[in-house]
Amino acid sequence: MTKKSFFSLGRLLLAVPAGAIATLTFAPYNYWLLAPVSIALLLWLLQAQTVKRSGLIGFLWGLGLFGTGISWVHVSIDTFGGMPKIASVFLMSSLISYLALYPAAFGALFNRFNRGRPFHQLMLSGPVIWLLLDWVRGWALTGFPWLWMGYGQIDSPLASLAPILGVEGITLALVLISGALVASVVYRNWKPLMVPVLIMALTWAANTVSWVVPDPTKNLDVALIQGNVPQELKWLPSERWPTLMKYTDLTRENWDADIIVWPEAAIPALEAHLPTFLQNLDSAARNNNSTVITGVLDQKEDGQYFNNILTLGKNAYGPYQYDKATRYSKHHLLPFGEFVPFGDLLRPIAPLFNLPMSSFSRGDLVQPNLEASGYSIAPALCYEVAFSEQVRKNVNIDTDLLLTLSNDAWFGTSIGPFQHMEIAQMRALELGKPLIRSTNTGITAVVDHTGQIIKQIPQFETAVLRATITPTEGLTPYTTLGSWPLYFYSLWSLTLSMILIRRRSGRFRDTRPVETE
């Protein structure tokens, strides 16, 4: 093996661990400084490479990131999917490989344009290409915006950008910082370091601004019920009433709370099958001047299934009646859990796809806030909280707090529930609203408007979290503008990059020969 071949192979081998260390930036590890390290390593590995080899380097980096970062998905597929081991491994490998195509596309596009002009690559077109591909990943095939790099910065100084530009703005800042580091070190030019200096100055300035104002006059007491019902028992007919009685007993002990919250699909039956139980619960809550919010599945007369949130007791809707109840219906459904992409092709393959309720119908993208005990609540069911634009569109000037219900029992003791919690924290920070999160097995927690967890209870315990919530007044810039500032920045950056290409200009050029295959 020649020296050149050795170093070429070394780039490929280094790409996998370079991507894998990025997983450590996310919860539960929270080593947020590793994010710019991982991105900078990728950008360095892409220097002076052909388009084809750049795509391969990006793909291997993506295998490292997603192979470690979403390993928790396999827990659900393998434990509850009813698949042969080889089938579950194949499905998981396919998902990881699909997600790795996005870093592969980044690598290829990175060296497709502006080759020989590293400043353009690292500071203009590169960060925007990364951002655009993140948006595509969050949309294609219903979207999978998990492990956007900005999420791992919830505890870093860059977090102060979230109320202005959202998690995508934090990701952009990370790629710009990483690009500046590579440009300054590899090409021995200190001027790009002005970019991270300016970004950190912006984060400091943003941190001094109070975008929203807490309103203690609207404080409310909440009780979040964590039932800790084993997933393998949850839907057994013999466990229906024991589960309902568990939640009812825990609720009865907390009637002094303004709002009592049960997890996603806490009621292990279809709503239409339990009218008497729900009427009695509604009456008890109303008599105690409290509201119960619960997740419940429903099937309409036309056969459509919905994953809903229902409010009972003290609300603006009156006594519970099945035909007149106001519900929130989940819009963003979980692939393979709540609907099967390419169902006609995949359903015969494995029992996982033959679950009777694996084909849910969508609710509307924007729905009225839920009303509970006089408070206006913007809900998101489970996976939906990862879709920042959807959650943002459901927040308005009257919204008091955010609510997310989930059942992360599917993912056992993996890192998945921690990443899910971190995403919920980012939504609270972006929108400047406190957030309550009730789950079956954890993580059940309360988050303030700055994205910090103020109280939580341990996973895998039957428990009740009691906390006082302080709603906020006002709207953050991100709530008002969404991603439009980033759209305009992307357009400006790409336009400027093309203008500079046409002028054949640049602050400095990479005169090194491109490494051949």
From Swiss-Prot:
<feature type="transmembrane region" description="Helical">
    <location>
        <begin position="162"/>
        <end position="182"/>
    </location>
</feature>
<dbReference type="InterPro" id="IPR004563">
    <property type="entry name" value="Apolipo_AcylTrfase"/>
</dbReference>
<dbReference type="InterPro" id="IPR036526">
    <property type="entry name" value="C-N_Hydrolase_sf"/>
</dbReference>
<feature type="transmembrane region" description="Helical">
    <location>
        <begin position="55"/>
        <end position="75"/>
    </location>
</feature>
<dbReference type="GO" id="GO:0042158">
    <property type="term" value="P:lipoprotein biosynthetic process"/>
</dbReference>
<dbReference type="InterPro" id="IPR045378">
    <property type="entry name" value="LNT_N"/>
</dbReference>
<dbReference type="InterPro" id="IPR003010">
    <property type="entry name" value="C-N_Hydrolase"/>
</dbReference>
<feature type="active site" description="Nucleophile">
    <location>
        <position position="382"/>
    </location>
</feature>
<feature type="domain" description="CN hydrolase">
    <location>
        <begin position="225"/>
        <end position="471"/>
    </location>
</feature>
<feature type="active site" description="Proton acceptor">
    <location>
        <position position="264"/>
    </location>
</feature>
<dbReference type="GO" id="GO:0005886">
    <property type="term" value="C:plasma membrane"/>
</dbReference>
<keyword id="KW-0012">Acyltransferase</keyword>
<feature type="transmembrane region" description="Helical">
    <location>
        <begin position="128"/>
        <end position="148"/>
    </location>
</feature>
<feature type="transmembrane region" description="Helical">
    <location>
        <begin position="90"/>
        <end position="110"/>
    </location>
</feature>
<feature type="transmembrane region" description="Helical">
    <location>
        <begin position="5"/>
        <end position="25"/>
    </location>
</feature>
<keyword id="KW-0812">Transmembrane</keyword>
<protein>
    <recommendedName>
        <fullName>Apolipoprotein N-acyltransferase</fullName>
        <ecNumber>2.3.1.269</ecNumber>
    </recommendedName>
</protein>
<keyword id="KW-0997">Cell inner membrane</keyword>
<comment type="function">
    <text>Catalyzes the phospholipid dependent N-acylation of the N-terminal cysteine of apolipoprotein, the last step in lipoprotein maturation.</text>
</comment>
<dbReference type="Pfam" id="PF00795">
    <property type="entry name" value="CN_hydrolase"/>
</dbReference>
<feature type="active site">
    <location>
        <position position="330"/>
    </location>
</feature>
<comment type="pathway">
    <text>Protein modification; lipoprotein biosynthesis (N-acyl transfer).</text>
</comment>
<keyword id="KW-1003">Cell membrane</keyword>
<dbReference type="GO" id="GO:0016410">
    <property type="term" value="F:N-acyltransferase activity"/>
</dbReference>
<keyword id="KW-0808">Transferase</keyword>
<feature type="transmembrane region" description="Helical">
    <location>
        <begin position="26"/>
        <end position="46"/>
    </location>
</feature>
<keyword id="KW-0472">Membrane</keyword>
<keyword id="KW-1133">Transmembrane helix</keyword>
<comment type="similarity">
    <text>Belongs to the CN hydrolase family. Apolipoprotein N-acyltransferase subfamily.</text>
</comment>
<dbReference type="Pfam" id="PF20154">
    <property type="entry name" value="LNT_N"/>
</dbReference>
<feature type="transmembrane region" description="Helical">
    <location>
        <begin position="193"/>
        <end position="213"/>
    </location>
</feature>
